[in-house]
Each structure stands twice: as structure tokens, then as C-alpha cells.
Amino acid sequence: MQAIAIHKFARGSAQKARLVADQIRGVNVEKALEILTFSNKKAAELVKKVLNSAIANAEHNEGADIDELFVKTILIDDGPTMKRIMPRAKGRADRIIKRTSHITVIVSDS
């Protein structure tokens, strides 16, 4: 049995979120929540919300026991980038790139 949760268009780069995702891949969900709680990265909060949603989906939809769940798969994909302009001195302009990502967490009990 497995349950899925997805957060699309999460504000933050996929490269930074993958640093957090690599720490919890294949880990028991209780341990994963502990790791994310004490991480000081912004991406950890985003991943933690998606993980909690996947746990709730497993418990509600599948009737799974939380103690047996582990993070089977976690994917961080690039989302669309928002391009903005920042005015600079002497009539110039710099491009600001605001990156987004898609976070997918799959939890399983086997």
C-alpha cells in the first residue's frame, strides 16, 4: 500500500529542495519528520508539509499504520520560472529569476 502527496509550484529552487529530500529518502516517517523539524532550510518546511499530507492520505484513504510507514520515493522536479526585471542605475535592468518546483512524496508500508 502506498499513498501520494504532491505540492506543485512550490516557491523555491529544486536544487535547494533536493538537498533536503536526499536526507529523508528511504527513512521511517517519524525519523523523517524529526529531521525536517530540526533542519534550518526553507525547503524543509515545504517538504514537511507534503510529507504530513502523504501520511494523512495513507491513514485516511488506506487505513495504514503510521508506525510502519517509510518514505518510499521523494521527487523534486523543476517547475516554471517567473522572470522579473529589476531596474538598475543608468537605465539598465537586471533579470530576476524566481524559481518554482514540484514536490512529490510517496510513502509505503512495505
From Swiss-Prot:
The keyword rRNA-binding applies. One of its GO terms (cellular component) is cytosolic large ribosomal subunit. Part of the 50S ribosomal subunit. It comes from Colwellia psychrerythraea (strain 34H / ATCC BAA-681) (Vibrio psychroerythus). Keywords: Ribonucleoprotein, Ribosomal protein, RNA-binding, rRNA-binding. The lineage of its organism: Bacteria, Pseudomonadati, Pseudomonadota, Gammaproteobacteria, Alteromonadales. Transmembrane segments: none annotated. One of its GO terms (biological process) is translation. GO terms for molecular function: rRNA binding; structural constituent of ribosome. Pfam families: Ribosomal_L22. InterPro entries: Ribosomal_uL22, Ribosomal_uL22_bac/chlpt-type, Ribosomal_uL22_bac/org-type, Ribosomal_uL22_CS, Ribosomal_uL22_sf. Belongs to the universal ribosomal protein uL22 family. This is Large ribosomal subunit protein uL22. PROSITE patterns: RIBOSOMAL_L22. The gene is rplV. This protein binds specifically to 23S rRNA; its binding is stimulated by other ribosomal proteins, e.g. L4, L17, and L20. It is important during the early stages of 50S assembly. It makes multiple contacts with different domains of the 23S rRNA in the assembled 50S subunit and ribosome.
